[in-house]
Every structure is written in structure tokens, then in C-alpha cells.
A protein has these predicted regions:
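Sec/Tat signal peptide C-region and signal peptidase I cleavage site
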Residues: 18-23
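Extracytoplasmic small-molecule ligand-binding "clamshell" domains
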Residues: 24-93, 101, 268
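Short helix-initiation/N-cap motifs at beta->coil->alpha
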Residues: 53, 68-79, 143-145, 180-195, ...
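A local structural motif
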Residues: 60-71, 152-157, 172-188, 197
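A conserved helix-loop-strand patch within extracytoplasmic ligand-binding domains
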Residues: 65, 94, 105-159, 163, ...
Length: 285
């Protein structure tokens, strides 16, 4: 094959890729898990619902773009984004330095604090810790809380969803050698917690309060709320890192468009309103 033909073939291949990725025109495909209530879940009919689903439609309206919500298992979320199964992630994904090595994020649109959950009557109830600690700040209160947790969780089994910031924290050793049991979904974590297969579970606090309210189970939040450090700096829209080619430029524009839309949604009170509807409080950033 001549150099000229190779060049033409390369150009056509690039155009074909762009065509495949953006054939839907103005449509933005947004990936979500559909299994992390109240952030995102499904109703009895299988329809995707939740805070982020409703917010996604709001942001698309501000961008004057059509939207499509794509369901994706959590542990394959970032790989699917990189493979261009969809254009953005809205799935309760916290903005962390580790994830920013692979993808980029919009500005945060919601706060998410993590907390341990146990069944009522557990020996872990009543731990003497601060109400909340920020691992990015550190200090004596943080060190004291981690020491208390290390002692309380020694020999205990803590259940957690796989490939999450919560698993990363437990695996870090900050709370000692905990027996970590991982699950594919948060629903599986909740079920094993209430069935007694876990001494405790770690996730976003609202994931447990939502489950307890809907199931009637006696789930109790214990210990401090966690933020910062391994837990990140709020939840944002995950987008591919922009390259220098035409596709990369489209990703860069999409990031800018999401940031502008989040600004508008925040200013007009949309994020606060939707958060209060789904969380029962204003989690907007």
C-alpha cells in the first residue's frame, strides 16, 4: 500500500471513529449504575430513577442537548467510559486523585460522606469518636478517631462494595487489619449486613439510611462521617481526559459544557431541590 493510500485510510478510519462516537448528534450518553439508591436505582418497572438520573436530565436541558442514560455495572464503569460506551459518568462517583489519573471530572455537584453501619444492638454502637473527620485536614481528632476505629474493628468483618473509595480506605490499613468482604453491588452489602454475615458495612451514609427507611431494618450509623483524603472531594461528572485529536477536543468541550450546566443548575436551585427530594437534605455543593 502506498504512503498516500495509507494516509487516506488513516483519515477515513479517524472519521469513522468520530462518526461512531458522535453519530447521535447532540445526544449525550450518561453512564450510571442503577443500583446505588438514592443516587441512582431502578423502580419496580425497571426504569432508572434517583438523584443523579433526575439531575442528568436537568443538566442536559441546560446544555440544550438530548440525553440517554446507559446502565452499567459499577466495577466496569470507568473502563466502559474509556471504551466510549457512553460519554460521561454520573454514578455517585467521588472525585479522587487516584481516579483523576485515568479520567477527568467536572466540578462537584454533591457532597458525599461515608459512614459505618451496623445492626441495632451491635457492640460497635456508642463508639467515642468525633461526629465527622476530614482525612485531608488530619490532626489530633482524626488520629484519635482512627485509633478508636482500629481497636473497635479488630477481628471484625466489614462489608463493602468492590472498586469503591470505601474499599480503598479499608484496604489502606488506616483502621488496622480489618477482614474486608467485597460485593458487586450495594444491595448485596445491605442484605449481608442485615442477615448477620457482616459485623459492619461502609458506604455513603445516605445509602444506609435510604435502605433502612425502605426495608424497615434496624440499621444504625456509627462512628464518624468520613470525607477528604481517600474519600475524595465531592461527587462530579466523570469524563474522558481530552487528547489532542478531534475526539479529544469534543471531550474537552463536553467537560466545559457540563461545568456551565452545573453552575446554572446550582444558581437556579435545581441541585438543592433534587437533592432534598431524594436525600431528605441539601447535599448540593
Amino acid at each position: 500500500m502506498s504512503i498516500f493510500k495509507k494516509t487516506i485510510f488513516s483519515v477515513l478510519a479517524t472519521l469513522l471513529i468520530i462518526g461512531n462516537v458522535y453519530a447521535a448528534g447532540d445526544k449525550i450518553r450518561i453512564g450510571t449504575e442503577g443500583a446505588y439508591p438514592p443516587w441512582n436505582s431502578k423502580d419496580a418497572s425497571g426504569k432508572l430513577i434517583g438523584f443523579e438520573v433526575e439531575l442528568a436530565w436537568s443538566l442536559c436541558r441546560y446544555m440544550e442537548r438530548q440525553g440517554e442514560i446507559v446502565e452499567q455495572d459499577w466495577d466496569g464503569m470507568i473502563p466502559a467510559l474509556l471504551m466510549r460506551k457512553f460519554d460521561a459518568i454520573m454514578a455517585g462517583m467521588s472525585i479522587t486523585a487516584e481516579r483523576q489519573k485515568t479520567i477527568t471530572f467536572s466540578q462537584g455537584y454533591a457532597d458525599e460522606v461515608a459512614q459505618l453501619a451496623v445492626m441495632k444492638g451491635s457492640s460497635l454502637e456508642g463508639m467515642d469518636t468525633p461526629s465527622g473527620i476530614n482525612l485531608s485536614i488530619g490532626g489530633s481528632d482524626v488520629n484519635k478517631a482512627l485509633k478508636t476505629l482500629t481497636g473497635a474493628l479488630a477481628g471484625k468483618t466489614v462489608c463493602v462494595q468492590t472498586a469503591t473509595i470505601h474499599q480503598n480506605f479499608l484496604d489502606s490499613g488506616d483502621v488496622g487489619s480489618v477482614n474486608v468482604r467485597t460485593y458487586k453491588t450495594q444491595d448485596e452489602v445491605n442484605l449481608d449486613l442485615t442477615s448477620g454475615r457482616c459485623d459492619a458495612a461502609l458506604a455513603a451514609a445516605v445509602a444506609f439510611t435510604d435502605y433502612a427507611e425502605k426495608s424497615g431494618k434496624s440499621v444504625v450509623l456509627v462512628g464518624p462521617t468520613f470525607s477528604g483524603g481517600a474519600f475524595g472531594n465531592g461527587v462530579g461528572v466523570g469524563i474522558r481526559q481530552a487528547g489532542d485529536d478531534a475526539i479529544g477536543q469534543r471531550d474537552a468541550k463536553l467537560l466545559a459544557d457540563f461545568n456551565k450546566a452545573i453552575d446554572k443548575a446550582r444558581k437556579n436551585g435545581d441541585i438543592s431541590r433534587i437533592a432534598i427530594k431524594w436525600f431528605g437534605f441539601d447535599a448540593s455543593m
